[in-house]
């Protein structure tokens, strides 16, 4: 959803706008204005949908897997319907160089990832919201008794996630110069969950560090590149990922049982 939005706004000419109607033609706007407006719209849309999933979890005690899966299906349906299932066009070629400039062979998009890591680390470790996040994740009943609003903290967690989704989709749109389809990014949710689990984030809640998540991402990225270099079939790579996830979750469950 975020990437489609960014492409609509930052597209070069009206090739993408033709799918949605000329009302979405932003070609007259300056490149910088288009890029910033696209970022704003990406964040607004992704945050809105994340809030919906968070609301159902916080208000009706719905399992997060169900609320987010339903959200994902709704978004996929909307994007597929809006784009008619066709790939959307390229964005203004000048825009990516503004925010992801080429410096030799160095992938400068990593710098944005570092900024996101620092911001999330600060929120988790240096703010009241971050401390409440761990408290609610570890034991929501005890957190509520101590005066913490479980509803607000849960919704806040989804809002933070939505903002990051929007910013990430905007960056990915820049990296891919707007080229993509409604199915773009499918499967990334499993990669993200796998990286978190391998990095020590507990499914039982209340446990996890940003350094662990970064480690998990590096492990899975290294695994993917290694298997590709070794010539392992792409379909077989999913088997290796599944085994790693199963092992990591099993260890997490064993730790939880031992604590009990």
Q: What are the residue ranges of the model-derived segments?
A:
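Transmembrane alpha-helical segments in multi-pass inner-membrane proteins
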Residues: 165, 176, 180-241
């Amino acid at each position: 959803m975020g990437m489609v939005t960014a492409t609509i706004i930052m597209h070069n000419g009206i090739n993408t706008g033709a799918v949605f109607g000329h009302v979405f033609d932003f070609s007259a706007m300056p490149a910088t204005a288009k890029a910033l407006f696209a970022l704003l719209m990406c964040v607004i849309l992704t945050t809105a949908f994340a809030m919906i999933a968070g609301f159902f979890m916080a208000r009706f005690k719905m399992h997060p897997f169900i609320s987010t899966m339903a959200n994902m299906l709704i978004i996929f349906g909307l994007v597929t319907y809006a784009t008619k299932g066709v790939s959307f066009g390229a964005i203004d070629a000048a825009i990516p160089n503004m925010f992801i400039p080429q410096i030799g062979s160095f992938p400068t998009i990593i710098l944005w990832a570092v900024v996101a890591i620092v911001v999330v680390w600060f929120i988790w470790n240096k703010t009241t919201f971050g401390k409440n996040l761990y408290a609610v994740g570890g034991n929501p009943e005890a957190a509520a008794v101590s005066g913490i609003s479980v509803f607000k903290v849960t919704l806040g967690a989804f809002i933070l996630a939505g903002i990051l989704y929007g910013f990430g989709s905007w960056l990915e749109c820049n990296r891919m110069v707007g080229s993509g389809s409604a199915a773009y990014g499918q499967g990334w949710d499993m990669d993200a969950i796998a990286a978190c689990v391998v990095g020590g984030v507990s499914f039982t809640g209340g446990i996890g560090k940003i350094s662990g998540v970064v480690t998990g991402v590096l492990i899975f990225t290294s695994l993917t590149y290694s298997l590709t270099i070794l010539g392992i079939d792409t379909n077989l790579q999913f088997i290796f990922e599944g085994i790693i996830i199963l092992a990591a979750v099993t260890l997490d469950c064993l730790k939880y049982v031992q604590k009990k």
